[in-house]
Design a protein with these regions (language model features):
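A carboxyl-terminal module marker
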Residues: 7, 12-13, 50, 122-126, ...
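Short beta-strand micro-motifs enriched in acidic
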Residues: 118-120
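Acidic-residue sensor for enzyme active/binding pockets
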Residues: 114, 307
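Extended, well-folded interaction surfaces typified by the phenylalanyl-tRNA synthetase beta subunit core
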Residues: 1-3, 7-108, 296-298, 304, ...
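General structural feature for long, well-ordered alpha-helical segments within catalytic domains
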Residues: 32-36, 91, 95, 111, ...
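Generic hydrophobic alpha-helical scaffold/packing signal
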Residues: 37, 77, 96, 100, ...
Length: 311
């Protein structure tokens, strides 16, 4: 209005308003986070929220080595107290504290998840902003075990389009997890998280009187690998052929190694496979185990029984 008075409205050209319209939808990153929430809640987990400020004593509670990178935490200049004096470098303490609170209140079969940031300094003292990384943290005790947690992780990976088979490296080296029940989650050659049973000593420190299980997934890596593109194929007019196969092998051979062989040998005919039994007992030689799979093959052109049996 002031410009019209100064310049005279007759000297101002008539134009149409311009602007950019955007589609009202979630960003790709938020879509991946939404899938994480949906999968966790579908599997019976409730969302929790914990503080980003913690005590440096947390690192001792988690039995971290003195030179562990997670001890390199950012100090708060004006903390409310020692309990909130550093920015967290792992979301695990908040999850274990929440599980302990529920256990002490006699809540049974607790399943919790959290989507929250951790803060990893590039150098100390700070010379630039830290690396903020979102972690998808799952924790539970009561009904369920290591394989229940593994199933949740696999379901999440499938829903965000990670179609390659993830593997589990048992040499995770996490002091806060049970030495024989932990694994790094590896996808496409990258470690994208870890999971396992909480170390009994750590569970005792936090006051959790049952076996507890956790999984921590690095969301930036998952977002980079995820895709929501889907391809569909018609239904094969030839019936699928299923075979049950049982194999005796040394205990040192991992199930993931067996499944890698199945995928490589199955070729184009392989539709699905499922582990349905692992047996160790008197009928099996010491140091060996029996592993049984159900394997389904299908073809869109032809499929003969001897072709299925050949591999």
């Amino acid at each position: 209005q002031r410009q019209m008075c100064i310049r005279d409205s007759d000297n101002i050209p008539t134009t149409l308003p311009t602007g950019e319209a955007t589609t009202g939808k979630l960003s790709f990153k938020l879509r991946v986070e939404e899938v994480a929430r949906n999968i966790a809640e579908f599997c019976g987990f409730s969302q929790g929220m914990t503080y980003s400020f913690e005590s440096p004593k947390v690192f001792d509670k988690l039995l971290l080595d003195k030179d562990d990178p997670m001890r390199q935490a950012i100090q708060i200049m004006n903390p409310l107290g020692e309990d909130y004096s550093v920015m967290r470098t792992t979301s695990l303490n908040g999850m274990l504290t929440s599980l302990a609170t529920n256990y002490n209140r006699r809540n049974k079969n607790v399943r919790l998840y959290e989507l929250g940031n951790i803060y990893l300094p590039k150098a100390l003292p700070l010379t630039e902003l830290p690396d903020e990384r979102m972690q998808f943290t799952l924790g539970m005790y009561g009904d369920g075990d290591f394989f229940s947690m593994k199933g949740v992780v696999e379901e999440f990976f499938e829903k965000v389009g990670l179609h390659k088979k993830e593997t589990y490296d048992p040499n995770a080296g996490k002091n806060f997890l049970h030495p024989g029940r932990q694994a790094n989650i590896v996808y496409d050659g990258k470690v994208v998280g870890y999971m396992g049973e909480v170390h009994p000593e750590v569970a005792d420190i936090y006051g959790i009187g049952e076996r507890a299980y956790v999984a921590v997934i690095d969301m930036p890596q998952i977002t980079e690998l995820a895709t929501f593109e889907r391809k569909y194929e018609g239904i094969a007019k030839y019936p699928a052929v299923s075979r049950d196969i049982s194999m005796v092998m040394p205990k040192s051979i991992l199930v993931g190694q067996v499944e890698e062989v199945i995928e490589n040998k199955g070729g184009a005919y392989l539709e699905s496979y499922k582990l349905f039994d692992i047996y160790e007992g008197a009928q099996i030689k010491a140091g060996f185990k029996s592993v049984a799979y159900s394997i389904t093959s299908v073809s869109y052109t032809h499929l003969r029984a001897h072709e299925t049996d050949s591999y």
